[in-house]
Amino acid sequence: MPSRLNVFWLCAAALAALLRCAPAAPVDGAFTDNPAGDTSGEEWETERPADPLIALLKVVLEVIKTHRQEFEAEFHIRYDVLAQYNIPSLPADCPSTNFSMEALLHRLLQGLPVYTALLKYVEKEEPKSQIPSRFRQNSELLKQRITGKMRHAVQVTPLTSSQEQQLLRDLDSSDTFHRKMTAHSILYQLRSFLVDCKNAINKKEKLRESRANRAMTPVTLYYQS
């Protein structure tokens, strides 16, 4: 019996010595430091989900983006010349400063029915353009996402038939070239309107997130002994 105990304790001592000499292995599931240049930990970082309204505005703007190439290819003049054309009853712009998020959303919502009516003029003068129909396909979803983001949702009604007819009559001209330029200018102004609103809303959203992150920053307390 004593000899068996001696053998047991000798084996235990030898095993302990081997464990002290062996390099430490990470415990299964434990976090370890990555070697320099190893980016395997990046999959743990999740990207902030895109704002649904901003994402949809980008989709609509992607459709309108083709207008510049089409216009310059047809007329061989600079795209920004369209800003010089005066179009009555254009919706008010979305300013980048001194406007609350709610006011920006309301401004965007108010502009949609006006541009929907103006695009009928574009269809008449530029029947091959796909932009008016593509815009209408997304306009109802745009309204839903705008009102869903508002604190106090409001109802913006479409223009009445008499208002729409008056709007289109104000654009009419006997000059064919002028009518075509007016149609292209409407598309130019629509793009500018959506870009300004998207950028202003995105700026407000990032500012809101920045303030929320600062409010959640942990405070370290130091105690003196």
Swiss-Prot record:
What the protein does comes down to: Cytokine with a wide variety of biological functions in immunity, tissue regeneration, and metabolism. Binds to IL6R, then the complex associates to the signaling subunit IL6ST/gp130 to trigger the intracellular IL6-signaling pathway. The interaction with the membrane-bound IL6R and IL6ST stimulates 'classic signaling', whereas the binding of IL6 and soluble IL6R to IL6ST stimulates 'trans-signaling'. Alternatively, 'cluster signaling' occurs when membrane-bound IL6:IL6R complexes on transmitter cells activate IL6ST receptors on neighboring receiver cells.
Q: Which GO terms describe its cellular component?
A: extracellular space
Signal peptide (residue range) = 1-24
Tissue expression notes? Expressed in white muscle, skin, spleen, anterior intestine and stomach. Not expressed in brain, gill, head kidney, posterior intestine and adipose tissue.
Name of protein = Interleukin-6
- GO molecular function, a single term: interleukin-6 receptor binding
Question: Glycosylated at which positions?
Answer: N98
Q: Does the keyword Ribosomal protein apply?
A: no
Report the induction information.
By LPS or Vibrio anguillarum infection.
Keywords linked to the UniProt accession: Acute phase, Cytokine, Glycoprotein, Growth factor, Secreted, Signal
Q: Does the keyword Glycoprotein apply?
A: yes
Source species: Sparus aurata
Taxonomically, the superkingdom here is Eukaryota
**What gene name does this entry carry?**
il6
Protein family per UniProt: Belongs to the IL-6 superfamily.
Q: Which compartments is it annotated to reside in?
A: Secreted
Quaternary structure and interacting proteins, as annotated: Component of a hexamer of two molecules each of IL6, IL6R and IL6ST; first binds to IL6R to associate with the signaling subunit IL6ST.
Q: Which Gene3D superfamilies match?
A: 1.20.1250.10
UniProt-listed GO biological process terms: acute-phase response; cell differentiation; glucose homeostasis; hepatocyte proliferation; interleukin-6-mediated signaling pathway; liver regeneration; positive regulation of receptor signaling pathway via STAT; regulation of glucagon secretion
